[in-house]
């Protein structure tokens, strides 16, 4: 369940959720802390024949580097978290993932990695906090399940910081130990 594209020398799988489901959470940052789950992700990379999966949907961003199943090279999960909601505490911006053969010009990258010749950035999407909150409350007033689940995130951002986005496999092991 993916679309493929090539950007420079990067073969990319594009999904909404994960490699198995449109609504999947297999590329969520909290699942990537589990070694057995990273093995499953490695299998998805081999099945798709890609170097990276770009995804969204899982609320918190993570750019997770994994060793390939054959031990030769690396693969990346490039998860932007949420385009339409804050991703970091105290930062009202949404995020999109830019994957390009040239570096990003400007200062609106919240996290970045380079894979061979390809530049990957979590680019901030400027949102007006007051307008976002007003539109949200008009759609999902206090007392609704959505308000209970998301309003505090929209108002202040989640308890997550830009320094937590880029992770290498050894860091995923340490993050799991901290849970």
Task: For the regions a language model picked out, list residue spans one by one.
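Conserved catalytic scaffold of divalent metal-dependent phosphoesterases
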Residues: 1-52
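Acidic, His/Gly-rich catalytic cores of divalent-metal-dependent hydrolytic chemistry
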Residues: 69-179
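Divalent metal-coordination and catalytic microenvironments
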Residues: 16, 57, 81
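Short gly/pro-enriched beta-turn/loop segments at secondary-structure junctions
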Residues: 7-10, 47-48, 55-58, 72-73, ...
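Active-site environment of divalent metal-dependent phosphoester hydrolases
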Residues: 20-22, 52-66, 85-89
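Internal, well-ordered alpha-helical scaffold/interface segments
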Residues: 39-43, 51, 56, 61, ...
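Generic detector of short, locally flexible boundary/turn motifs and exposed helical patches
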Residues: 16-20, 38-39, 60, 74-75, ...
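Short beta-strand scaffold segments in enzyme catalytic cores
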Residues: 2-6, 61-65, 95-98
């Amino acid at each position: 369940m993916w679309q493929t594209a090539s950007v420079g020398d990067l073969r990319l799988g594009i999904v909404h959720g994960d490699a198995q489901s449109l609504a999947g959470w297999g590329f969520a940052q909290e699942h990537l802390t589990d070694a057995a789950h990273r093995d499953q992700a490695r299998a998805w990379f081999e099945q798709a024949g890609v170097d990276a999966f770009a995804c969204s949907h899982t609320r918190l961003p993570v750019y997770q580097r994994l060793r390939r199943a054959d031990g030769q090279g690396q693969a990346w999960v490039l998860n932007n978290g949420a385009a339409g909601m804050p991703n970091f505490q105290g930062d009202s911006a949404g995020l999109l993932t830019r994957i390009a053969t040239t570096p990003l010009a400007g200062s609106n990258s919240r996290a970045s990695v380079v894979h061979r010749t390809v530049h990957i950035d979590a680019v901030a999407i400027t949102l007006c906090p007051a307008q976002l909150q007003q539109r949200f409350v008009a759609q999902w007033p206090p007392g609704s399940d959505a308000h209970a689940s998301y309003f505090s995130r929209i108002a202040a951002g989640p308890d997550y910081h830009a320094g937590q986005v880029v992770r290498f496999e050894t860091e995923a092991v340490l993050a799991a130990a901290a849970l």
